[in-house]
Every structure is written in C-alpha cells, then in structure tokens.
Design a protein with these regions (language model features):
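Structural helix-adjacent loops and short alpha-helical linkers that scaffold large soluble proteins
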Residues: 1, 51-70, 112-126, 171-184, ...
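Alpha-helical scaffold segments in carbohydrate-active enzymes
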Residues: 2-10, 41, 48-51, 55, ...
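Non-catalytic C-terminal accessory modules of carbohydrate-active enzymes
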Residues: 124-134, 139-142, 153, 169, ...
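Extended glycan-interaction surfaces of carbohydrate-active proteins
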Residues: 2-34, 74-159, 192-224, 242-244, ...
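Intrinsic-disorder/low-complexity regions
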Residues: 38, 57-59, 89, 202-204, ...
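Residue-level preference for long, well-ordered alpha-helices that form the structural scaffold
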Residues: 31, 38, 58-61, 65, ...
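Compositionally biased regions
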Residues: 17, 22-23, 63, 321, ...
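Well-ordered alpha-helical segments within folded domains of soluble proteins
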Residues: 35-51, 100-112, 157-173, 232-245
Length: 330
C-alpha cells in the first residue's frame, strides 16, 4: 500500500495508473488518467487492511486504513459519479469525466462506495438492455456505445466471467440477492452452452470471454486467438463459486465456522459433503409428507443461519450427526 501511495496517488487524493493495469486491453478508455476500477480497488484494499487491523487488535493500523478508505470513497463519489448517466466514470488528466460506460464502473459496488440511492441507480443499468442488461450478462462495454460489438471484440462488448463475478459480488454488498441469483443462472446457462454446444461439429470448451447477446464464445477480428480456451482461471468462479454462493445461496465463513443460507424460493436444492474446515456438511431442502424441511448432516458442531424468502431468519447451532427441521416450525 505504501508503494502504491508513493507512486500513484495524486494531489486530489485519487490514484493515477496506466489503463493497462486494468487488463482491459482494447477498451475505449482513451485519455484515462484516473481509472475508476483502480481507485475502487485501492478503496477495497484499504477497507480490508482496516479489517485486518481490527482482527489483530491494532487500533492504529485499523484507524489509518479506515481513514484512507473514507478519503478515497469521498473523492470517488464527488469526482467520478455522473449524475446524468447514473454511472461512475474514468477521469482524464484535467479531472473531466470520460463519456464511456464500461464494466469498470461497477467496481464501486464491490468497494461499497455508493449510498443506497446511487447504488440503485447504478444497478438499474444491469437490467437495461440498452446498456448492460444484455441476454448474457454483463458486457464489458455499454450496448449504447458506438464501439460496442455483438461479437465481443475483446473489451468492446465481450462477457468476461471474472468481471461477472465482480459485479455479482457487488450486488451482494447491497442485498440484491434475487438479481444476483437471476444473473448467475443466466451466466451459467451460456457457460454450459459453450461447454456443450448444440452443434455437434463444434467442440465445447470453457472460454475466456463470450458473446453478449447470443450463445457461443466471443471473437475478435484483429486477434484470432481470442478468446483463449481451457480458461480455468475464471471457470471456478463462474461455475463452482456462483453455483454454491448465489444459485443455492450459501455463504460460508471458515474462521467463524458458520453457514448462512438465503433461500430465494422453496425448491429441492442444497449441497452434499461441503468442506467446512475439516468438517464435511450436507444441507438439503426437500418436500416431504410433513411439508418443506431442511435435512442436515455434519461431523462437528457449526452455526447455521437460515433466511427464508426474506421473511423468516433464524440462527441455530447444528450438532454432529443427522438432523432435520420443518420450515413451517421455524
């Protein structure tokens, strides 16, 4: 953090970094001097450094980085938020907002920078087909931009699984669980279609990037090798993590030995033999003759919080062995 402060922090409190630092190699972000994603990432770093200070009971460390976090947050909100577009945008060297909406504008959600009103306005773009609400969520460039391509063309419209993970985790920060689940399911459909295409002449694969409004991998005329196949770097995020955390709805904390389950609707689902710090657990919802019930099995004690349809919420200690609970009795 100190090195970043010394080399990239400017007098206005924001950070200036090369656009290449975002890895968005052909994104139309010309003249960017203050990238919104880099500054949001710095806020995230400061936030977690402060949290580590709390864990270590180091009050000076915690206060130092908490102050830095709020300093960055204030500057991002005051300088990088566009009231007309309801979007966070990059700045040029003169601190003018650049008129391009990219996926980088959603990094502030993950950093918990916008207030509830700004977050709601920003999140509306994710359901707007004219901007980021494409069939396959979420394109790396707004669909109303002149550089947007239905074929993806790198960061001119392609859907990158690793960017989707960032956006979906940002939605969680503001309790948009239903939208996060819906977008996860849609994203997983396109991942699965790319892995098992309907056309038998095609070989399936896990790709680096996908098309925004149709099935299949993205393409780029000037770079035939794009997107890379066998791209396992982000495959786990798009498949395993989103399935467990957003489709099923489980939030797991190994240090606290806790499992939170947000059940969006009553249906048969769950997970078997999930590792919880040397403790294999099984959690399943099923409908029996007695009604909807949750069946659980565990090797050791852990704490289970269940939130059903945002109407019932309860935390219970779950002992080792097998047990079940009727949802109506909670």
């Amino acid at each position: 953090m100190n090195w970043l402060e010394e080399n990239y922090k400017q007098e206005n409190g924001l950070y200036s970094a090369p656009c290449a630092s975002s890895t968005m190699f052909n994104s139309p972000r010309e003249n960017v001097f203050y990238p919104i994603d880099f500054n949001s990432a710095m806020a995230i770093n400061a936030s977690y450094m402060s949290a580590l200070g709390d864990i270590l009971n180091d009050k000076d460390l915690s206060f130092k980085y908490k102050r830095l976090y709020f300093s960055i947050k204030t500057r991002i909100n005051s300088l990088m938020w566009n009231n007309e577009e309801n979007f966070y945008q990059d700045l040029d060297k003169d601190q003018n907002k650049l008129p391009v909406k990219t996926i980088a504008g959603f990094w502030p959600l993950l950093a918990e920078i916008p207030n509830a009103d700004k977050a709601a306005s920003l999140i509306e773009h994710l359901s707007n087909p004219k901007t980021f609400g494409t069939e396959h969520p979420f394109p790396t460039l707004s669909a109303d931009d002149t550089h947007f391509s239905e074929n993806g063309e790198g960061f001119c419209g392609s859907v990158f699984p690793i960017m989707n993970f960032m956006v979906i985790k940002g939605l969680e920060k503001y309790q948009y669980y239903e939208l996060a689940r819906e977008c996860s399911i849609r994203h997983l459909y396109f991942i699965l279609e790319g892995l098992m295409p309907n056309e038998q002449k095609q070989n399936g694969d896990l790709y680096e990037a996908y098309c925004p409004n149709k099935e299949g991998k993205a393409t780029m005329a000037s770079l035939p090798d794009f997107p890379r196949g066998h791209f396992l770097i982000s495959a786990g995020l798009s498949t395993i993590a989103l399935m467990i955390e957003n489709v099923i709805g489980l939030s797991i904390s190994l240090p606290r030995k806790t499992v939170d389950w947000i059940i969006p609707n009553l249906e048969i689902m769950g997970i078997e033999n999930l590792s919880l710090k040397r403790n294999l657990i099984t959690i399943l919802s099923n409908k029996s003759s007695r009604g909807w019930e949750i069946q659980m099995e565990s090797e050791k004690l852990y704490y289970f919080t269940i939130n059903i349809l945002d109407q019932k919420k309860k935390t219970l200690p779950i002992p080792s062995g097998k047990c079940s609970m009727l949802i109506d009795k909670l």
